Amino acid sequence: MGVTGISTFPCCGKDSVDIVERQSDHHRHHHHHTHEENEDEDTEVEAELPRTEPPPKVDPELGPVPQLEEMEPELPSKTTPETEGDSYTESPEQQNYRMESLKPYEEEEMGGRYRSIPVQTSKHLFWSNKLIQASEHSLQKALEKHHRSPQEKSISISQVYTECTQPPSSPPVSRPTTPTAIGLADLINFASSLAVASSSNMALPNLENMIKGTSEKSQNTSLDFCQPVQAIKFAQATQITQISSEKQDESPKSMAHKSWTRETRNVACSYLDINQAGLKTATIQGEVKFVQTPIASPQLQEAKEDSVPGTKKGNPLLLKIHFKLSSPQPQRND
């Protein structure tokens, strides 16, 4: 029992160990050989399978990459050319339409505000100031056609833009191509008178005092209360028709020619204060169009006692004032 060593266990000798190792090596070689044969058989089976049926799972390194690349260009070919054209042109057309519709709207907001004032009345006849005048050639024709004495220089609404009194003594600025300008004060006074006349809040005598004025006194009247800085270019409408004055034979005494007072001037200009700094530098471009309505029956044309001379009920005067007020941009002091 006390002897120890390799010889004590004959089964664990060198020869036996070598034999065991050789057997294990032989077993390993044999197992490796059979494994290689199995792999060869598997590859042969896999090579035969694609001929009959595609494999359910394909190696990702071989199959999917070329198949996806080939299928991508085939997808658009399934769609018809009509759907391709619709999908290609819908989005750009919508974008262009939106850009075109929003762009002028933004320019209008930045450039100024457009206002249109339609007025209709059948009871009032408006009288204009001497400074409201038409273009030079229209003025000459109006003076030749409707020649009046200096005492009857007050003109009706039918002659607001076709006839006026004598021009000021100072030589006007020569503008051969463009018509003469209409002042901002004149347009405001005229529009204010129309606004007052269209409402029933003010009595007719006061309205008559506001709108009427003699030419002799109006020449000496100062307009510093609404002196314009920028003139308004008047575009004379071709559709304007002259309304014949039905009471030219009436004596001038029946027409109350009264000059403008400071009170009435302030009321006329109260609708838009031109003395403000912003409006003094603003640019206003406007156009006034008169439309003559069809003549009604003689029974409806009988004048009322409370109406201003020169108009008859049933034959209203229609006009449209369209103007644009542009505020100047602030100047930068660089």
Curated annotation (Swiss-Prot):
Residues 48-60 have a biased composition (Basic and acidic residues). Highly expressed in the testis and weakly in the brain and heart. Residues 37-47 have a biased composition (Acidic residues). It comes from the Eukaryota. Residues 77-98 have a biased composition (Polar residues). InterPro entries: SPATA32. Coiled coil: none annotated. The modification Phosphoserine is found at residues 135, 138. One of its GO terms (biological process) is spermatogenesis. Keywords: Phosphoprotein. Residues 24-98 are annotated as: Disordered. It holds the Pfam family VAD1-2. Interacts with syntaxin-1 and ACTB. This is Spermatogenesis-associated protein 32.
